[in-house]
Swiss-Prot record:
Compartments (UniProt record): Cytoplasm; Nucleus; Chromosome, Centromere; Cytoplasm, Cytoskeleton, Spindle
The entry's keywords: Cell cycle, Cell division, Centromere, Chromosome, Chromosome partition, Cytoplasm, Cytoskeleton, Metal-binding, Mitosis, Nucleus, Phosphoprotein, Ubl conjugation, Zinc
Family as reported in the entry's similarity comment: Belongs to the IAP family.
GO molecular function terms listed in the Swiss-Prot or TrEMBL record: metal ion binding; nuclear retinoid X receptor binding
Originating organism: Xenopus laevis (African clawed frog)
Name recorded for this polypeptide: Baculoviral IAP repeat-containing protein 5.2-A
Amino acids binding Zn(2+): 70, 73, 90, 97
Pfam families in alphabetical order: BIR
Domain notes: The BIR2 domain is required for vascular development.
Cited Gene3D superfamilies: Inhibitor Of Apoptosis Protein (2mihbC-IAP-1), Chain A
Self-association state and partner proteins as the record states: Component of the CPC at least composed of survivin/birc5, incenp, cdca8/borealin and/or cdca9/dasra-A, and aurkb/aurora-B. Interacts directly with incenp (via N-terminus). Interacts with rxra; the interaction is stronger in the absence of 9-cis retinoic acids.
Length: 157
């Protein structure tokens, strides 16, 4: 399986209480709604229900119709086969995900438990954003270094 970075589109239901989209994803039904065009639906291990239970949301791209991302640890996976078990794949590719380590449903968490869990989720998001900015900065620094080295080489000739 390969990791890529799609955007998740979350449809809202009229009967859901007002809350941030990210909090809505703690609910199984909200994650399940993202699988409307999932390529595996019957006679397979990776049904939409099992994918959502494992914490995944479906975020397809034109080139990758089977891309999913854990709403919590942000691990992105694609290249699913009908026999792939979503929970096993999640544990294999992101063993430290706190969502899959929960011993109860997210809806059963106390407010304190939920807020602690969401704090960890926020840290994960911030780390991912920071890593992205660092990668962009390093790429730009390498580009500038190349230009400077070329200028230096031109001057010494």
């Amino acid at each position: 399986m390969m990791s890529i970075s799609p955007i998740v589109s979350l449809r809202r239901c009229d009967n859901e209480p007002s809350m941030p989209d990210e909090w809505r994803l703690y609910k199984l039904a909200s994650r399940l709604r993202t699988f409307s065009n999932w390529p595996f639906t019957e006679d397979c291990a990776c049904t939409p229900e099992r994918m959502a239970e494992a914490g995944f949301v479906h975020c397809p791209t034109d080139n990758s119709p089977d891309v999913v991302k854990c709403f919590f640890c942000l691990k992105e996976l694609e290249g699913w086969q009908p026999e792939d078990d979503p929970m096993d794949e999640h544990k294999k590719h992101s063993p430290s995900c706190l969502f899959i380590a929960l011993k109860k449903k997210a809806e059963e968490l106390t407010l304190s438990e939920f807020l602690k869990l969401d704090l960890e989720h926020t840290k994960i998001k911030m780390q991912k954003q920071m890593n992205l900015h660092i990668e962009r900065f390093q790429a730009k620094a390498n580009e500038v270094r190349g230009h400077l080295e070329k200028l230096d080489a031109d001057e010494t000739q």
